[in-house]
Regions:
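Divalent-metal (often Zn2+) His-rich catalytic cores of metallo-beta-lactamase-fold enzymes
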Residues: 132-139, 149, 161-261
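Histidine-centered catalytic micro-motifs
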Residues: 52-62, 114-122, 186-194
Length: 266
């Protein structure tokens, strides 16, 4: 298996290139708009990118899924969450994914888990490697649902949605991933410095077991107290977040070109 984490300082963005070296198939998770590094690394490793995945509709940076697909002459399938309903449907995507769906990338199996809370449509990908053990999960791409030392903030869609999303986040943390074993590694979409969480740790990966033991997000308490602790002292979100989320929902224009099929923001 080939695994590469690409980390962009400043906004502290983490994206991933994962591939099966025997079959040459690969997948990119949550790409940024600067797509050349993914293409260069894939070429160096003799990989061809089969899927481009988004864990959710990002609010802090322009997602590079369309840019990457275009640079690959359309030879990659863009997969997004199908749990967003009419408000958060991404019309440019080739495929919508739902809870329990699986993607095959050579010997690698990526299973979809719907983990709402940071956003309504948020999904995570649990990865198994059949060349090692087809029954045991190895790691998980958690997007902005679960960070090192933190969880994704539930207040980015405004006051009307904040409490609903916070309740969903509680269920995602204590129910949806409860059966995953402690040894599962987590690879989030952000590190320390991102405003997509309140107190994200400085490491760029962890394990579920470690987070369950030390993270404030996993401390057992009542639902009401957990949500109260989550929301207190939450920093203000940047003013561009809501606009950016809509751009990523509709599909950002390709760099240096015009895309008439995309709903452009005023």
């Amino acid at each position: 298996m080939f695994f590469h984490q690409r980390f962009v300082p400043g906004l502290a963005i983490a994206s991933y290139l994962l591939g099966d070296e025997k079959t040459g198939e690969a997948v990119v998770v949550d790409p940024t708009r600067d797509v050349q590094p993914y293409i260069d690394i894939a070429r160096e490793e003799n990989l061809h990118i089969k899927y481009i995945l988004e864990t959710h509709i990002h609010a802090d940076f322009v997602c590079g899924s369309l840019e990457l697909q275009n640079s690959l002459s359309g030879h990659a399938t863009i997969c997004v969450s199908g749990h967003g309903g009419a408000d958060w449907k991404q019309p440019f995507a080739d495929r919508e994914l739902s809870e329990g769906d699986r993607l095959e990338v050579g010997s690698l199996n990526l299973e979809v888990i719907h983990v709402p809370g940071h956003t309504p449509e948020h999904i995570a990908f649990v990865v198994k490697d059949a060349s090692r053990n087809s029954d045991k999960p190895w790691f998980m791409f958690t997007g902005d649902f679960l960070f090192v030392g933190d969880v994704g903030r539930p207040d980015l869609l405004g006051e009307d949605e904040k409490q609903k999303l916070a309740n969903q986040l509680y269920d995602s943390v204590f129910d949806k991933i409860a059966k995953l074993p402690d040894y599962v590694e987590i690879f989030p979409a952000h590190g320390a410095g991102s405003l997509c969480g309140k107190a994200i740790g400085s490491r760029n990966s962890s394990t579920l077991g470690y987070e369950r033991r030390v993270s404030e997000a996993f401390k057992e308490t009542t639902r009401e107290k957990w949500i109260e602790t989550l929301l207190e002292d939450m920093p203000l979100s940047p003013s561009y977040f809501q606009r950016m989320k809509k751009i990523n929902r509709d599909g950002p224009a390709l760099l240096g070109s015009k895309r008439h099929s995309v709903s452009r923001m005023p």
